[in-house]
Amino acid sequence: MPQLSQDNQECLQKHFSRPSIWTQFLPLFRAQRYNTDIHQITENEGDLRAVPDIKSFPPAQLPDSPAAPKLFGLLSSPLSSLARFFSHLLRRPPPEAPRRRLDFSPLLPALPAARLSRGHEELPGRLSLLLGAALALPGRPSGGRPLRPPHPVAKPREEDATAGQSSPMPQMGSERMEMRKRQMPAAQDTPGAAPGQPGAGSRGSNACCFCWCCCCSCSCLTVRNQEDQRPTIASHELRADLPTWEESPAPTLEEVNAWAQSFDKLMVTPAGRNAFREFLRTEFSEENMLFWMACEELKKEANKNIIEEKARIIYEDYISILSPKEVSLDSRVREVINRNMVEPSQHIFDDAQLQIYTLMHRDSYPRFMNSAVYKDLLQSLSEKSIEA
């Protein structure tokens, strides 16, 4: 065990000679001077007590006591550990090794072509990091050559044929070549490919992505694309068939006067619907009349396919929340329409049509009667009748 020097021992003796310090270690010295041979036996109410004869020593006798060397030995251990701890804290950290700079000399000839160099200036930090990552990539070609494009360039068919024959799977290559030979005349002799259609003759001859991996037929994809285009063309035709403006003769003075009697008389005539729709356009609510008219046209259809297509068009134009011409419907009616869209019928929008009809009757019809559109029309017809 390491021992303290003579100077440190003298300092500790002076320090512990104080009364306040002596009282802290007083039980230790009393225990050392405990005399077990001297006991005074007293009998007090039947209990035996051993009263030791403890001699207390003044602070001046601390250096002469036999417990002082043991105390010094106990204190030397924590003091030495504290000294080692503080010396470790005050010790300087070892110098760091200098960082190795990346060598971009193989890539410097390619920098002017890529417009990345500025004379002899130092490369930016971000660019150096990118170049370092490029150098760390496995399989990089030596000499700074440019990397190959990610997508392979299509090779001529002769090279593909030779590559397929020289591949380790000759059966797969031969089957692929046979499939291509069969597809080329089949695509050229397809009756559905009219000469007037752009790209119809070359669509089957060009190999698609599936032919390279699955060896499927391109003719089936061509037929599928043509079938997918048919509903689109039909939907455009059906969308054009939906009424946007009704042809009607000029209304008479009696008809215009009858519009003021009830909303039903206004909606029953084409001239009344056109006049009312012109008013709704000024209030930015023309979609209500368009939706009502589209539902009336849907009720006249009998073909199931046309009904399904027209129902889908009406849903996309007026029911969908993504449509700019969405009509105002409550949640119950929307839920019913969404459930019935699986198998739509002629009357799928009856509840929605009635709700929009009621909305126009209560909200828009009174304002139409007081609008300038109706008053000007009524005044012009009245003047014509007077002149006649």
Swiss-Prot record:
Isoform 5 is expressed in brain at high levels in the caudate nucleus and temporal lobe. The keyword Nucleus applies. One of its GO terms (cellular component) is nucleus. Its main location: membrane. Keywords: Cytoplasm, Glycoprotein, Lipoprotein, Membrane, Nucleus, Palmitate, Phosphoprotein, Signal transduction inhibitor, Ubl conjugation. CDD domains: RGS_RGS20. It is a lipid-anchor. GO terms for biological process: G protein-coupled receptor signaling pathway; negative regulation of signal transduction; regulation of G protein-coupled receptor signaling pathway. The keyword Kinase does not apply. It is found in: Membrane; Nucleus; Cytoplasm. Residues 138-199 are annotated as: Disordered. Residues 185-197 have a biased composition (Low complexity). PROSITE patterns: RGS (PS50132). Fatty acylated. Heavily palmitoylated in the cysteine string motif. Residues 262-378 form the RGS domain. GO terms for molecular function: GTPase activator activity; GTPase activity. PANTHER family: REGULATOR OF G PROTEIN SIGNALING, REGULATOR OF G-PROTEIN SIGNALING 20. Forms a complex with G(alpha)z/i2 subunits and mu-opioid receptors; the formation of this complex results in mu-opioid receptor desensitization. Interacts with OPRM1. Inhibits signal transduction by increasing the GTPase activity of G protein alpha subunits thereby driving them into their inactive GDP-bound form. Binds selectively to G(z)-alpha and G(alpha)-i2 subunits, accelerates their GTPase activity and regulates their signaling activities. The G(z)-alpha activity is inhibited by the phosphorylation and palmitoylation of the G-protein. Negatively regulates mu-opioid receptor-mediated activation of the G-proteins. This is Regulator of G-protein signaling 20. The lineage of its organism: Eukaryota, Metazoa, Chordata, Craniata, Vertebrata. The gene is RGS20.
